[in-house]
Amino acid sequence: MSRGDSMLRFEIKDRDAAGRIGKLEVNGKKIETPAIMPVVNPKQLIVEPKELKRMGFDIIITNSYIIYKDKKLREKALEKGIHRLLDYDGIIEVDSGSFQLMRYGKVEVTNREIVEFQHKIGVDIGTFLDIPTPPDAPREKAEQDLKITLERAKEAESIKQIPMNATVQGSTYLDLRKLAARKLSEMNFEIHPIGAVVPLLESYRFKDVVDIVIASKMGLRPDRPVHLFGAGHPMVFALAVAMGVDLFDSASYALYAKDDRYLTPQGTKRLEELEYFSCSCPVCSKYTPQELREMPKEEREKLLALHNLWVIREEINRVKQAIKEGELWRLVDERARAHPKLYAAYKRLLEYYHYLEEYEPITKKSAFFKISEESLKWPIARRAKERAEKVKAKFPESIPHPIFGEIPKYLSLTYPFAQSESEEDFQIEKPTRENAILYIMAIAEYQFGEGAGEAFRDAEVEIAKTGMPRQVKKNGKRLATVRAEDGLLTLGIEGAKRLHELLPYPVMRVVVNKEAEPFARKGKDVFAKFVEFADPKIRPYDEVLIVNENDELLATGQALLSGREMVLFSSGRAVKTRRGVEEKK
């Protein structure tokens, strides 16, 4: 897979689990992901699009087929453009009629016609007319539908003039989902929705949704945003984002309001059952449930829709804050307990360790909290135990840990072992001047792999007044620093040189092209578009060696992407460079 020319820019700004906070830019308009698109029906505007914009929704989705089918709407859209038609200056994405195709079995438009129509009315993100196969359909039907979808994808690719969705289909057949994802990833599209999951969500088959999303994600390029079509209930946001979903859409805010239903992050309640509002949004702060019940239907519907939107927006922000703090798994764990089927889906997700581990940061801002038995299966915990076992082979002296069992004594300062909380306390063993170097060597083995400890065998370790190791030097030159926050090593350029000599290519390498080489030497950050190759075992926030195509060391820094992501992303930073070989002190 190579970097393709894209009409849309997407880069990762922050991350946790397989979730990411991203910046998506199209037609000069920017949004931050994860983001939710309220569904706007141009025939039934419960909440005006400009009001949605004021509430902070900078992207909406509407249905181009509904506009196309209505003669008056079609003529207005062609004359004014969709932004003036809806009186909305944010990003407008459109569906193509696929949902109607799934619900009613047919649509009166061709794939080419709807793609060309979307361009003519000036949408920001279009969608070609894929075939959504419902769950549990006969395999023969799923295969035939997917064949047509892929044919239409090729047609759309050849004529599209706007950024476009390419929806992953395949019913509940995971191999077909993965196949569709791989085929669509090879084409020039910008966003990949995962389609035909609404029936599963409506019937609380969340475990099947997890299987479908992961199968799709495993086949998709990581540099393209993923949209979970029809997922608009806040109870699933944390779980979906942890899987790697970036975009959601919600018609539920309006549909539930029509039925006097009230959204919460834990589920849906009927207005007639409520005595109190636990929410503090503008609607719930002003009215009581009784007052809403006594209102005329139309007024009540609008206010309930507004409440539902505030709850949706609040939960998206809560998910993003959890990512910033390295707490997304804790939020997923909490939300999963709202419903047994959601809890089962959470447990299923944790079975996909090898997928999740690639994107799991190597260190986090927050301590590891053992809040449940499931937390021991979080990727950060499983990886730590696996790495500790390898270190134990070389440093067999061990101590008991209340969460992780027997761990190497010399890793007792290191994340997540020292930075963890459970029912029982863990007492770290501070180094002595005699054994401090063993701590450094063990940390290097844990962090950089087998044999890395030898790079520091002859080093001197400075112990701070707190009794903790800090600077690692040789003949006055800094090799590394033990970070106070997580007990891991930040490399100095001399330490990077030693590791570079010791570790075989391509271990911990990020290879940059000739254009970026002089900037890396001077300590400038490395952007993804200049990365030629990266060790696929690099994980987010690893300390890495930046080299040129001849494997000459240029700099050292902290990876912001996984190794595979660095090679595929064309926007954003790949490595935060700490020190270049030619950088002046």
Swiss-Prot record:
InterPro entries: ArchSynthase1/Queuine_TRR, ArcTGT_C1_sf, PUA, PUA-like_sf, PUA_sf, TGT-like_sf, TGT_C1, TGT_C2. Keywords: Glycosyltransferase, Metal-binding, Transferase, tRNA processing, Zinc. Zn(2+) binds at C279, C281, C284. Pathway: tRNA modification; archaeosine-tRNA biosynthesis. The active site is at D95 (nucleophile). Substrate binds at D130, A196. It catalyses: guanosine(15) in tRNA + 7-cyano-7-deazaguanine = 7-cyano-7-carbaguanosine(15) in tRNA + guanine. NCBIfam families: arcsn_tRNA_tgt, tgt_general, unchar_dom_2. This is tRNA-guanine(15) transglycosylase. One of its GO terms (biological process) is tRNA wobble guanine modification. Binds 1 zinc ion per subunit. Belongs to the archaeosine tRNA-ribosyltransferase family. Pfam families: PUA (PF01472), TGT (PF01702), TGT_C1 (PF14809), TGT_C2 (PF14810). Its cofactor is Zn(2+). GO terms for molecular function: pentosyltransferase activity; RNA binding; zinc ion binding. It comes from Pyrococcus furiosus (strain ATCC 43587 / DSM 3638 / JCM 8422 / Vc1). Its EC number is 2.4.2.48. Residues 507-582 form the PUA domain. Exchanges the guanine residue with 7-cyano-7-deazaguanine (preQ0) at position 15 in the dihydrouridine loop (D-loop) of archaeal tRNAs. The keyword Lyase does not apply.
